[in-house]
Amino acid sequence: MAVPPVTELTDRARAIFQLVVEGYLESGQPVGSKTLSQEQSLDLSPASIRSVLADLESIGLLAAPHTSAGRMPTETGLRLFVDGMMQVAEPTRAEREAIAQRLKRSGPIEQALEATSSMLSDLSGAAGMVMVPSREPRLAQISLVPLGQGKALAVLVGEDGAIENRVIETGDTPAHVLEQVSNFITARLAGRTLAEATAAMRKEIADGKSALDTASQNLVERGLAVWTEDAAERPVLIVRGQANLLDESALEDLDRVRSLLDDLENKQSVAELLETARDAEATRIFIGSENRLFALSGSSVIASPYRDREGKVVGVLGVIGPTRLNYARVVPMVDFTARSLGKLIG
């Protein structure tokens, strides 16, 4: 159903509609005319309120559950409220400082992403989601440092100063050969991504143009493979706080919650949904059936892209929960968290 403009509602209808939505988002329960009649700002009789509620229901903004005499917003109604009536509650100074400090203490980027997902879950009372950055950094050099007992520490340095290391098996390879292999790889990976460097070196070896002997060529393969395999196994999505979805109201609708938890297990599909927010200028809000993945579970997703220091979008983060999320609070919180995480991305 198309969302009617807010301006088409009378002042009375707009006021009652807003009170119903805000009451529902706060309590998770339908709001009745008796409750509304106690609002001093309305100064209307229960009969007048019931008449307006019926009108709002007839145009698809409210619905009356069979188990209650009250009304709750439909997905169409929630969209109208979010787009035209919601007053966002910006994070307080204390909340902003807490977010920044928690991210600073998180350590390497992988830990920062996990901390971000957990933090979004804690702040929203829903499940937090963070897509792992899809970017491939340019590399500067690799060093193979002998450790003894047939092992070496492979140290990979990026142009942005990031350092990663892995232990690889080297057999009885002498130290001077490790240095030769390090120089060979460094000369060919500088300024390239790992994928670009790997393709170039493997082609050079396959074409017989490499000056390395067979043992050294095998060592090159092992040195590259340890990162290639590791990258392939990295998760595309980090989800935390699924337990938040099992609140008291969830017990009344276990089928919906079970469907939502099943959907969250399909992380590739969730990541594809978040990808649709990658090019968004601002935080995106998907309400209920507006996204196909979570349509059956009646859930909402709030997502925002996060950028590196150069302003390039490298991932998306957000929260997912029931459609009665506190949008006014969660939307600016997701936006601020995305900007804070971006400051940590090189």
Curated annotation (Swiss-Prot):
GO biological process, one term: negative regulation of DNA-templated transcription
Domain of life: Bacteria
Record keywords: Repressor, Stress response, Transcription, Transcription regulation
InterPro entries associated with the record: GAF-like_dom_sf, HrcA, HrcA_C, WH-like_DNA-bd_sf, WH_DNA-bd_sf, WHTH_transcript_rep_HrcA_IDD
Keyword Protein biosynthesis: no
Family matches, as Gene3D superfamilies: 3.30.450.40, Heat-inducible transcription repressor hrca homolog, domain 3, Winged helix-like DNA-binding domain superfamily/Winged helix DNA-binding domain
Any one GO MF annotation of this record: DNA binding
Function description: Negative regulator of class I heat shock genes (grpE-dnaK-dnaJ and groELS operons). Prevents heat-shock induction of these operons.
Family under the similarity heading: Belongs to the HrcA family.
Official protein name in the record: Heat-inducible transcription repressor HrcA
